[in-house]
Every structure is written in C-alpha cells, then in structure tokens.
C-alpha cells in the first residue's frame, strides 16, 4: 500500500478531514502545516519561537521555515505520512522534492479534492468560523487558484494525481480515496 501521500484542494474541500481519517486508519503521520506550526510554538522550540515572532508581527511564515518544520517531522520513524496543506506553490514543491529525495521517501499519490466553488462557499458559510464570510472565502479561493491550482497540472504530468469528487458525503469520499489507493 502507498504510504507517502499529499492532499490538495481549495480551503474547505475536506483535506484535513480526509487526511485525518486515512491517517488514523493506517497509522500514518498526518502532517498539517498549521498544526505543525502551532505544535512548535506550544513546545517552545527554537523554530517555534521564530514562528511565534513572525506570526505576532502578522507576517507569513517563510517557505524555508515551513520546510524545516515539515522535514523535521518527516525524518521521524513512521509507517507513512500524509501532507495536508503543503506544498502550496511550485517553489515549495521543488524544495519538498529535494527533501523527499534526500530522505528516500518519494511522494506516491496526490489526492486532489475537487469541489465546485458554489458548493465550497456554501459549506464554508455553514462551517461558521469567524473568518468564513463570503468576501473572505472568495479572496481565499482567488489566492488558491493563482498559487496552488498549478500544482494540479504538475502532479498530473507526473502521473501522481488522483481526482476525488469532494462534493459528496464523508463516507463516499473516503471510499473513493481508499479505492484509488488500492488500485495503485
């Protein structure tokens, strides 16, 4: 079974939910960049102190710093891993590829959670986070389409991409992911 996976998709597509379900079922590390950054801050590590300082200034954490934190977690003994929310752009893809080659853990499947914008907007509004209003959601989708969507073609060209219809119910989406993993 494939053990080195990546979940791509727009905000609210269900990446974190599906990655968590799959990692729990297979004892894989679930590496969500947001959670990894918060963990470093909570543990008060040197990296965490840098991240906290950057975030307190309202700035974005650099690609290099995020990569260091991801690499630190990939280096651990594991039964496999799932990346969720990283990489987000082609520059990050290239840096990640170098790390994965170095640790001999190549990416094996990229699941693209495909969902129509109107379904996504409705889902996010129902979710009800305080930053989930229609204007903010549309801005996040625009940024996603500009920076992250090009990764879909990149991974498709490498024959790593599996398209998952993500506008269905949780069980149907999970079953589709498991079925596509079994066929690889």
UniProtKB/Swiss-Prot annotation:
Per the record, the GO terms for biological process are: AMP salvage
Compartment list: Cytoplasm
User: Which keywords does this chain's UniProt record carry?
Assistant: ATP-binding, Cytoplasm, Kinase, Nucleotide biosynthesis, Nucleotide-binding, Transferase
Q: Which reaction is catalysed here?
A: AMP + ATP = 2 ADP
Q: Where is this region: NMP?
A: 32-61
Question: What broad class of enzyme is this?
Answer: transferase
User: GO CC terms for this protein?
Assistant: cytoplasm
What Enzyme Commission number(s) apply to this enzyme? 2.7.4.3
The record's region (LID) falls at 126-132
**Annotated positions binding ATP:** 12-17, 127, 168
Q: Which residues bind AMP?
A: 33, 38, 59-61, 85-88, 92, 129, 140
Q: Which GO terms describe its molecular function?
A: adenylate kinase activity; ATP binding
Which pathway, per its entry? Purine metabolism; AMP biosynthesis via salvage pathway; AMP from ADP: step 1/1
From what superkingdom does this record's organism come?
Answer: Bacteria
Give the domain section of the comments. Answer: Consists of three domains, a large central CORE domain and two small peripheral domains, NMPbind and LID, which undergo movements during catalysis. The LID domain closes over the site of phosphoryl transfer upon ATP binding. Assembling and dissambling the active center during each catalytic cycle provides an effective means to prevent ATP hydrolysis.
Assembly and oligomerization: Monomer.
What job does this protein perform? Answer: Catalyzes the reversible transfer of the terminal phosphate group between ATP and AMP. Plays an important role in cellular energy homeostasis and in adenine nucleotide metabolism.
Quote the NCBIfam families the UniProt record gives.
PRK00279.1-3, PRK14527.1, PRK14531.1
> What family is this?
Belongs to the adenylate kinase family.
Q: What is the designated name of this protein?
A: Adenylate kinase
Organism expressing this protein natively: Prochlorococcus marinus subsp. pastoris (strain CCMP1986 / NIES-2087 / MED4)
Q: Which gene encodes it?
A: adk
